[in-house]
């Protein structure tokens, strides 16, 4: 679990290191607030994604299942600044094995609530679904704005990073890949 006391001390030390007074009125409760926030935004470190996966048998369904625009918030592990965006998650069931739609969003949420790289997050989502459901294919696309590019360094607000992970038929079959990418990119 997260050591909130250690976080509080570290935040207090950071405030002092940047020349602030951690005992002034506006900052007095900041270490506690940050510790509670970290417990929430890093909850995925202590949650097994396999615990939320529930598989249903739907023998008649053999077409692409896509959930688009799943909101995600994660923390870039390089600067501990947020990246915020959406995930599009699609898969093609094998032998009618399907996940509940909300489970796709839960998988995204759990894996995003860790210090992350967008590239790794995209792959972890795809690999988790491949392992859990053994579908014919999985496609995951994430579009996100990284505050480490917005607030510091290059300072380019609005720049979006797009990553994709394709598994199974979506990687090997051009026609299937084109179909799923067309669905993901459609504006409707």
From Swiss-Prot:
<dbReference type="GO" id="GO:0005525">
    <property type="term" value="F:GTP binding"/>
</dbReference>
<keyword id="KW-0547">Nucleotide-binding</keyword>
<dbReference type="GO" id="GO:0006729">
    <property type="term" value="P:tetrahydrobiopterin biosynthetic process"/>
</dbReference>
<keyword id="KW-0479">Metal-binding</keyword>
<keyword id="KW-0378">Hydrolase</keyword>
<dbReference type="InterPro" id="IPR020602">
    <property type="entry name" value="GTP_CycHdrlase_I_dom"/>
</dbReference>
<comment type="similarity">
    <text>Belongs to the GTP cyclohydrolase I family.</text>
</comment>
<dbReference type="Pfam" id="PF01227">
    <property type="entry name" value="GTP_cyclohydroI"/>
</dbReference>
<comment type="subunit">
    <text>Homomer.</text>
</comment>
<keyword id="KW-0862">Zinc</keyword>
<feature type="binding site">
    <location>
        <position position="76"/>
    </location>
    <ligand>
        <name>Zn(2+)</name>
    </ligand>
</feature>
<dbReference type="GO" id="GO:0006730">
    <property type="term" value="P:one-carbon metabolic process"/>
</dbReference>
<dbReference type="GO" id="GO:0008270">
    <property type="term" value="F:zinc ion binding"/>
</dbReference>
<dbReference type="InterPro" id="IPR043133">
    <property type="entry name" value="GTP-CH-I_C/QueF"/>
</dbReference>
<protein>
    <recommendedName>
        <fullName>GTP cyclohydrolase 1</fullName>
        <ecNumber>3.5.4.16</ecNumber>
    </recommendedName>
</protein>
<dbReference type="GO" id="GO:0046654">
    <property type="term" value="P:tetrahydrofolate biosynthetic process"/>
</dbReference>
<feature type="binding site">
    <location>
        <position position="148"/>
    </location>
    <ligand>
        <name>Zn(2+)</name>
    </ligand>
</feature>
<dbReference type="InterPro" id="IPR018234">
    <property type="entry name" value="GTP_CycHdrlase_I_CS"/>
</dbReference>
<dbReference type="InterPro" id="IPR001474">
    <property type="entry name" value="GTP_CycHdrlase_I"/>
</dbReference>
<keyword id="KW-0342">GTP-binding</keyword>
<feature type="binding site">
    <location>
        <position position="79"/>
    </location>
    <ligand>
        <name>Zn(2+)</name>
    </ligand>
</feature>
<dbReference type="GO" id="GO:0005737">
    <property type="term" value="C:cytoplasm"/>
</dbReference>
<dbReference type="InterPro" id="IPR043134">
    <property type="entry name" value="GTP-CH-I_N"/>
</dbReference>
<comment type="pathway">
    <text>Cofactor biosynthesis; 7,8-dihydroneopterin triphosphate biosynthesis; 7,8-dihydroneopterin triphosphate from GTP: step 1/1.</text>
</comment>
<dbReference type="GO" id="GO:0003934">
    <property type="term" value="F:GTP cyclohydrolase I activity"/>
</dbReference>
<keyword id="KW-0554">One-carbon metabolism</keyword>
């Amino acid at each position: 679990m997260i050591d909130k006391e250690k976080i509080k001390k570290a935040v207090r030390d950071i405030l002092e290191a940047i020349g602030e007074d951690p005992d002034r009125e506006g900052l007095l409760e900041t270490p506690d607030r940050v510790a509670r926030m970290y417990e929430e935004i890093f909850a995925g470190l202590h949650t097994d994604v396999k615990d939320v996966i529930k598989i249903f048998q739907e023998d008649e369904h053999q077409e692409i299942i896509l959930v688009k625009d799943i909101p995600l918030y994660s923390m870039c592990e390089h600067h501990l600044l947020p990246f915020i965006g959406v995930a599009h998650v699609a898969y093609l069931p094998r032998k009618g094995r399907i996940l509940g739609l909300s489970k796709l969003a839960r998988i995204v949420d759990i894996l995003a609530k860790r210090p992350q790289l967008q590239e790794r997050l995209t792959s972890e989502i795809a690999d988790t679904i491949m392992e859990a459901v053994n579908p014919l294919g999985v496609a995951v696309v994430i579009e996100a704005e990284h505050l480490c590019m917005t607030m510091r360094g290059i300072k380019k607000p609005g720049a979006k990073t797009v990553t994709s992970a394709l598994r199974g038929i979506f990687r090997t079959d051009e026609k299937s890949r084109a179909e799923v990418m067309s669905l993901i990119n459609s504006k409707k």
